[in-house]
C-alpha cells in the first residue's frame, strides 16, 4: 500500500522521496549497499566485496533487470563465484557440472537458483542458508544432493498442478469470457502455485490467481500482465479478502473458500473496466533492429565486456 511502515528506517530506492539514481536494485542489492555504507563508517575498507558472489546470486534469482548497477554487480559477482573458496557454492557447482565451465547469468537463473529456491518452496529454506554458510564439505555435499532431489520434486509437482489447472480452464467455457483466471484446487502445494500462475499467465496472456484450498481456506498466488495492476485489483476486492500483499505484477492473498465465487465475479468486473481486447493480445517486444553484418563474434565479445 502507499504507506510507509512505522519503522526506525525504511531503506528502499523505490521510495517516492528517494534521491538514489537507480531504483531497480533487488533486495539483496539494497542490503549490499547497506553493508558497503557500514564498511565505510567502520573503517573496514573493501570487506563488502566479499559478499559479491551472494549478491550476484540473489540479483539474478530475483529477476530484476540486469542493467545499470545490477549488471555491474552480477558481472563482478560471477567472477567471484567462479573462483569461490566457499564450500557450499563450490559443491553446488560440482554437482551441477559447472566446476570448470564458464558461468553466466543464465547459469545462475536456470541452474543454481532453482536448486537454492527449492528448499523454501518444497522443504525448509534454512537448508539453503546452511549450504551457503557451512565449512563442512560432507555436510555441503549432502545438502546439495537434498536440494537436487527437492528441485526434481518441485518440477514434477509444478507439472502436475499446471496440468490440473489447464484442464479446469479448458473444460469450463465460462473462463473464455473471464479476463482474470481464478482457479482453485484441493491442497495444491503453496510453494509452487506462484510458478504455475506465471505459466498460466504466459499461456493465456491473462492475469491469473491460483488458489490452494484446505480447511475452507484458500491461499492464492497471482501473476498479472502489463496494463493490469494486480495489487489495485485486490484493493478493489478487499471486502472479500482476509489478507493480501504484493505489487503490480504479483501478489499473494488468503480468501475464504465460500467467498471464491464472489471474488472471481468482482475481480473480473473490475478487470472489464480496465482491460480491453487489445490488452489480451500478447505483444512481441523488440529491443533493437540489427543488420546481418553486425552479427559477429567480435560484437558479441564487445557486448559481453560492457
For the regions a language model picked out, list residue spans one by one.
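Hydrophobic helix-and-loop "lid/oligomerization" segment in the mid-to-C-terminal part
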Residues: 39-260
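Cysteine-nucleophile active-site neighborhood
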Residues: 35-37, 259-262, 267
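Conserved strand-to-helix beginnings and helix N-cap segments that scaffold or border functional pockets
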Residues: 4, 125, 193-195, 264, ...
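A contiguous loop/helix-start segment that scaffolds small-molecule binding in enzyme catalytic cores
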Residues: 63, 86, 269-306
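Short amphipathic alpha-helices in soluble, non-transmembrane regions
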Residues: 234-238, 264-271
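Short gly/pro/ser/thr-enriched loop/turn and capping motifs at secondary-structure boundaries
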Residues: 1-4, 17-19, 215-218, 228
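Short alpha-helices
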Residues: 4-44, 48-60
Amino acid at each position: 500500500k502507499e504507506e510507509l511502515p512505522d519503522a526506525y528506517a525504511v531503506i528502499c530506492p523505490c521510495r517516492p522521496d528517494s534521491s538514489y539514481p537507480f531504483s531497480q536494485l533487488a533486495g539483496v542489492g539494497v542490503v549490499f549497499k547497506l553493508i558497503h555504507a557500514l564498511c565505510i563508517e567502520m573503517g573496514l575498507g573493501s570487506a563488502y566485496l566479499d559478499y559479491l558472489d551472494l549478491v550476484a546470486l540473489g540479483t539474478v534469482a530475483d529477476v530484476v533487470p540486469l542493467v545499470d548497477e545490477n549488471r555491474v554487480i552480477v558481472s563482478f559477482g560471477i567472477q567471484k563465484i567462479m573462483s569461490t573458496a566457499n564450500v557450499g557454492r563450490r559443491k553446488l557447482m560440482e554437482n551441477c557440472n559447472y566446476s570448470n565451465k564458464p558461468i553466466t547469468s543464465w547459469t545462475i537463473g536456470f541452474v543454481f537458483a532453482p536448486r537454492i529456491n527449492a528448499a523454501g518452496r518444497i522443504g525448509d529454506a534454512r537448508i539453503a542458508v546452511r549450504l551457503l554458510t557451512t565449512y563442512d564439505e560432507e555436510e555441503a555435499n549432502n545438502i546439495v544432493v537434498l536440494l537436487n532431489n527437492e528441485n526434481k520434486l518441485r518440477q514434477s509437482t509444478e507439472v502436475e498442478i499446471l496440468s490440473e489447472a489447464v484442464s479446469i480452464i479448458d473444460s469450463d467455457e465460462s473462463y473464455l469470457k473471464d479476463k482474470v483466471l481464478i482457479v482453485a484446487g484441493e491442497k495444491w502445494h503453496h510453494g509452487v502455485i506462484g510458478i504455475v500462475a506465471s505459466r498460466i499467465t504466459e499461456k493465456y496472456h491473462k492475469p491469473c490467481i491460483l488458489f490452494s484450498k484446505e480447511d475452507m481456506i484458500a491461499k492464492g498466488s497471482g501473476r498479472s500482465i502489463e496494463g493490469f495492476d494486480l495489487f489495485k485489483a485486490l484493493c478493489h476486492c478487499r471486502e472479500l479478502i482476509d489478507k493480501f500483499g504484493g505489487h503490480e505484477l504479483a501478489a499473494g492473498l488468503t480468501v475464504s473458500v465460500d467467498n471464491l465465487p464472489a471474488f472471481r465475479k468482482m475481480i473480473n468486473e473490475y478487470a472489464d473496466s480496465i482491460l480491453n481486447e487489445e490488452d489480451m493480445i500478447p505483444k512481441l517486444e523488440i529491443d533493437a533492429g540489427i543488420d546481418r553484418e553486425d552479427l559477429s563474434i567480435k560484437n558479441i565479445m564487445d557486448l559481453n565486456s560492457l
